[in-house]
Amino acid sequence: MPRSFLVKTHSSHRVPNYGKLETLREANGSCSACKELAGSRHLPDEEAPCNPSDPLQPWDSTSAVACISLPLLPNHRETLGVSGPEPQETSWVGPRAAQAPSVTLKDSFTLPPLLVLPTRWPPILGPDGALNEHLRAEGTSRVPGSFECIHCHRPYHTLAGLARHQQLHCHLPTGRAFTCRYCDKEYASLGALKMHIRTHTLPCICKVCGKAFSRPWLLQGHIRTHTGEKPYTCSHCSRAFADRSNLRAHLQTHVGTKKYRCAVCPKAFSRMSLLARHEEAGCCPGP
């Protein structure tokens, strides 16, 4: 037969690829009586190409979750003589989310969620770097210092800070340790090693005095000592600072809370540096 007679025709409406749903044979979409996906022999083998001019079908709806109906499943259960409701909920997300509203059909079914949040938060990482269910803190609110290292019990405010700290514990089972060529320190990831090597190479150099730093923001704060720029101003008084950390320490003097107390005398201080200076001066010298 000449090749000119071989004409491939396409459907005017896009049909869903029910063949992909065969992987859900053991999920909620299958019959609980015979474990067979009802109507699977009627499913098409391939999906027709999408034409933008075609009218939208229910399976093209993807605003949040669009559901596909399988009306063959209830009829299939009736032929088996099985009574009772069949739990059917499987979510389907189609390719044209912005063009159609969400459509929910009867007897639809929902896919299991891709992400299940833990019942308790915040978590504490165990020795293997995984979440330990029995070590999670009670409640769901994040409190300061709620992320604790299981190795040295050092508290952290965020999970990201705890993850960066645990790079120092090279005995974590990562399968490979990265050793610094300048010292004997080891790290669990290559990224942590590269950040550490910058403390040896000091690539950020001041063009005014030649002083070198490991981080760009450290160099930027140092340049302010040459220019005299103090962009961080206190909202309570007229004092300004070149570094944000100095402003945070200064704000403690306005709050009125002095949590650093001397162990010898009843004096208290708002900053740890002031307490250290007080102790070095000898608040209560002995005989």
From Swiss-Prot:
A zinc finger (C2H2-type) spans 147-169, 178-200, 204-226, 232-254, 260-282. Highly expressed in skeletal muscle and thymus. Lower expression in heart, lung and spleen. GO terms for molecular function: DNA-binding transcription factor activity; DNA-binding transcription factor activity, RNA polymerase II-specific; DNA-binding transcription repressor activity, RNA polymerase II-specific; RNA polymerase II cis-regulatory region sequence-specific DNA binding; RNA polymerase II transcription regulatory region sequence-specific DNA binding; zinc ion binding. Residues 1-20 are annotated as: SNAG domain. GO terms for biological process: negative regulation of transcription by RNA polymerase II; regulation of DNA-templated transcription; regulation of transcription by RNA polymerase II. Keywords: DNA-binding, Metal-binding, Nucleus, Repeat, Repressor, Transcription, Transcription regulation, Zinc, Zinc-finger. InterPro entries: Snail/Krueppel_Znf (IPR050527), Znf_C2H2_sf (IPR036236), Znf_C2H2_type (IPR013087). It holds the Pfam family zf-C2H2. It comes from the Eukaryota. One of its GO terms (cellular component) is nucleus. Its main location: nucleus. It is found in: Nucleus. Transmembrane segments: none annotated. Seems to inhibit myoblast differentiation. Transcriptional repressor of E-box-dependent transactivation of downstream myogenic bHLHs genes. Binds preferentially to the canonical E-box sequences 5'-CAGGTG-3' and 5'-CACCTG-3'. Belongs to the snail C2H2-type zinc-finger protein family. Binds E-box via C2H2-type zinc finger domain. This is Zinc finger protein SNAI3. It comes from Mus musculus. The gene is Snai3.
